[in-house]
Design a protein with these regions (language model features):
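Cytosolic juxtamembrane amphipathic/interface segments immediately preceding
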Residues: 13-20
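Short, aromatic- and cysteine-enriched interfacial helices/patches
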Residues: 1-4, 109
Length: 383
């Protein structure tokens, strides 16, 4: 009997964690809980109009930070203290599953490299061209790239403002199927469309200095098609601001802590202010689409906002489908500059279409943005 009692105590001692292990588990669980809370707050920020609380524009940008932080802490927890962390991490990520999928969709059975064009499809390309590459040689290459996409609709933002260069671009597209061209703007911004379908009308929906949204009525063989080309309000971040932020993130900043803090506040303040202006632009888009209710819609452009943002959420709430979410793959970063890697260019469509392919071409070297494309299929034959 004594021997049996000793064996029981040995097993009990072996299963009891040491004080250090217990403290580590508690700290890890606490850190995981804080990261999950941040993840939930950033995910929920899409429901809040920045005009009510401007800092939600910054909270959405923090989503990937909290996401990767949560994943990292959860994996560490599963390796060392699984009993304390497995359920917590599962619940934390599960609650945000839809938002995570929007940020990084996975479609293993969709081939975005090959496509067979049919009359039942529309291929759309949206590209912030950074003034068509700035420089004639790169401009020629960029135009050649767009022609080679064999798209039915090309929407561009930050187009070429020089009238002579615009005429040259028009002449390049003249012998192609996409020879209908319409553009408008100033020295600060040119927004335009290149289409395989006749352009019935171009209308300015709303504009800010350097940003504008235009609506187009196209004559498609199936009937009138509405296209909205968006360049939502930019965050107005200058090159030095971005470089300073990059240096700080990489621990290479030569500024003192106070200067770093002031620069960070300036950066966040600009992002927050621009988010409120994007909200006003979404209102204008909603009013425009209400005027064309019942007609098929394609909406695309440079949103200057990520998949986890009020702008993107509001556009989707207008009854539009996010093509990249439905048929894209991975993060699809469309803007890569300094330490910033985000998808801020998007393509949406009305329920008249089904996206079957969507892709961000991360190899195109002509602009500070990457072009995004989508192939849309008409769901029903025209009655």
């Amino acid at each position: 009997m004594p021997f049996f009692s000793k064996s029981q105590n040995s097993r009990k001692d072996a299963s009891t964690p040491s004080p250090m292990a217990h403290i580590f588990g508690m700290l890890l669980s606490g850190a995981l809980g804080i990261s999950i809370l941040g993840l939930w707050i950033s995910a929920a920020s899409v429901y809040i109009d920045p005009r009510l609380f401007k800092w939600v524009g910054v909270l959405g940008l923090a989503f990937p930070i909290f996401l990767f932080g949560t994943l990292f802490l959860w994996i560490i927890g599963l390796l060392f203290v699984p009993r304390k962390t497995w359920l917590l991490g599962l619940i934390g990520l599960g609650v945000c599953a839809q938002r995570i999928y929007t940020y990084c969709p996975i479609h293993p059975f969709i081939d975005n490299e090959t496509t067979t064009a049919t009359t039942n499809q529309i291929k759309v390309v949206s590209y912030n061209t950074f003034f068509f590459g700035r420089g004639m040689e790169q401009q020629d290459e960029l135009v050649r790239y767009l022609i080679d996409q064999h798209a039915d609709i090309i929407c561009f933002q930050e187009g070429e403002a020089n009238p002579d260069n615009l005429k040259k671009i028009e002449s390049r597209f003249a012998p192609t199927p996409t020879h209908y061209i319409s553009y408008e703007g100033t020295q600060e911004e040119v927004v335009g469309i290149i289409s395989a379908y006749p352009i019935l009308e171009q209308k300015l929906i709303i504009a800010y200095p350097g940003n504008a949204i235009y609506g187009y009525r196209l004559q498609h063989p199936r009937g009138e098609l509405i296209v909205v080309n968006c360049h939502f309000r930019s965050n107005l971040l200058s090159g030095p601001t971005l470089e300073g932020y990059t240096d700080m993130m990489h621990g290479k900043s030569k500024e003192d802590k106070r200067s770093q803090w002031n620069n960070t506040k300036t950066l966040f303040s600009k992002i927050a202010h621009s988010a409120t202006e994007r909200s006003e632009m979404v209102d204008a888009v909603e009013d425009y689409l209400a005027q064309h209710k019942g007609k098929p819609v394609i909406l695309c452009g440079d949103f200057n906002d990520t998949p986890v943002s009020y702008t993107r959420y509001r556009v989707a709430s207008l009854g539009l489908t996010d093509a990249f979410r439905e048929a894209g793959q991975g993060f699809g970063f469309s803007f890569r500059r300094n330490a910033i890697r985000v998808r801020i260019d998007h393509i949406f469509c009305s329920k008249d279409f089904e996206p079957i392919q969507a892709k961000v071409d991360e190899e195109a070297p002509y602009s500070d943005h990457q072009p995004i494309s989508a192939t849309l299929v008409w769901k029903n034959e025209k009655k």
